[in-house]
Every structure is written in C-alpha cells, then in structure tokens.
Amino acid sequence: MKTTLFASRAASGLILLTALAQWAVHSEVATPAPLSPPSIDGTYELMKRVMANGTVLRPPSIVALYTMADGRFSLNLFVKNADGTIASESSVGRYTFSADKYCEWIVYTIRNNLDKPGVTNEAPAVTDHCAPVTSKDGRFNFSPPGEGVEVSFGAEGFTAKIGGEFVDRWRKIR
C-alpha cells in the first residue's frame, strides 16, 4: 500500500512537473511596452501676458504662435507697446529635448524693439546651447540658453516667465 501511494504521488508530481515545463516552454515572457521619450512638440498660442504690475495683455495687444516639431522650432511674436509702437520677434531654429536636458540653436532671428530699440538679427549670445531640465508634477521646467526666461511645459501648454517683468501663458492647440 505504501509503495502504491508513493508511486501514485510520484506520478502526480511528474505530471505536474511536465505541465509546468510545457507551460514555461510555450508561454511568452511579458515585456513592458517601451516608454515613449518625453516631448514638448506641439503648436502653442499665446493666450495672455500678465505684467508685474498686474496688467493683463491679450490679443490683439499681444499675439504669438510657437511651433516645435521634430527638433525644429518657429516663433512669431507681436506686442503692441503702451506708446503704440510694435515690438516683434520672428525666430527659427533647432532644438533637442530629453527628460534632463534642453538644447537650442537659433538659425535665424529678427527682433524689432524687443530687447533694445531698433531692428536686429543678432541672436542672444550663449556660451552653452544646453540647459538642465527638471521634472515635477508632470511638468518640465528649464531656462532656454540666452533668453533669460524660465519655462514650464505641461500637457495643456506652458508658461514663460521673465524675472519681475511678466508671465506668458501659452495654450497647446496642436
């Protein structure tokens, strides 16, 4: 009887072992889906500029469109100054973006009454084209080289802040 019980248990164990081996051989290892790299690509429309004194500028006093796609960018900005003159910028360039670094190279720019009176096609001077990126609460934060601006990108758009001067609010439209 003990021999029969032992043989029965051994056979059951062998069947279980065979089933597990078959399952292991024929099952596929689950691999996690690859994570897509972080991206700030999109087309953004400037919704408003809040000045340090609380004044809010909205279109048509300020109008801008910023497109970033596949490592290329284009920015067009027009601001009606308090004295009625127009300040503007149109820039095109290249950029790279990762979770820890943003790099930017302005290929061409024309600026009118923006950084200084008159028209210039000189891009801001930079010693390093790259800046560190930090991530917090689903937002990417960095300061593009040479611009003196702090940006914070999220799914809905981004904000751009220049010191004690103003904060721009951009909405992602595409």
Range-by-range predicted roles:
Residues I15-L17, A21-S90, R94-R174:
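Lipid interaction determinants
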Residues K2-G13:
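Bacterial N-terminal signal peptides that target proteins for export
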